[in-house]
């Protein structure tokens, strides 16, 4: 499953998402959700301890002035890769 997180980690229940995610899933942070991938944040630690792969939409990082502040452990992707993720996963859940 592809989980898309578009809200700030301070305005959504990421712990509930993380209880559902498995190693076969991908998590994509976009819009205000990119805040969850800030270096040294508690939210990032939770995301990285989960078996799902973590992706961050690069255009949204740039739009929020967060270039250089996102963890190297999260994979920055383009819209093209976002489309690839949607094609790979038959199911998607917006968080």
Curated annotation (Swiss-Prot):
It comes from the Bacteria. InterPro entries: DsrEFH-like, Sulphur_relay_TusB, Sulphur_relay_TusB/DsrH. Transmembrane segments: none annotated. GO terms for biological process: tRNA wobble position uridine thiolation. PANTHER family: PROTEIN TUSB (PTHR37526:SF1). Part of a sulfur-relay system required for 2-thiolation of 5-methylaminomethyl-2-thiouridine (mnm(5)s(2)U) at tRNA wobble positions. This is Protein TusB. It comes from Yersinia pestis.
């Amino acid at each position: 499953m592809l989980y898309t997180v578009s809200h700030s980690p301070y305005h959504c229940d990421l712990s509930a998402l993380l209880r559902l995610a498995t190693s076969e899933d991908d998590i994509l942070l976009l819009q205000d959700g990119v805040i969850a991938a800030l270096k040294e944040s508690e939210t990032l630690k939770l995301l990285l301890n989960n078996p799902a792969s973590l992706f961050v939409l690069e255009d949204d990082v740039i739009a929020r002035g967060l270039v250089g502040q996102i963890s190297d452990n999260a994979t920055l992707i383009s819209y093209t890769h976002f489309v690839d993720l949607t094609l790979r996963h038959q199911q998607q859940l917006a968080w």
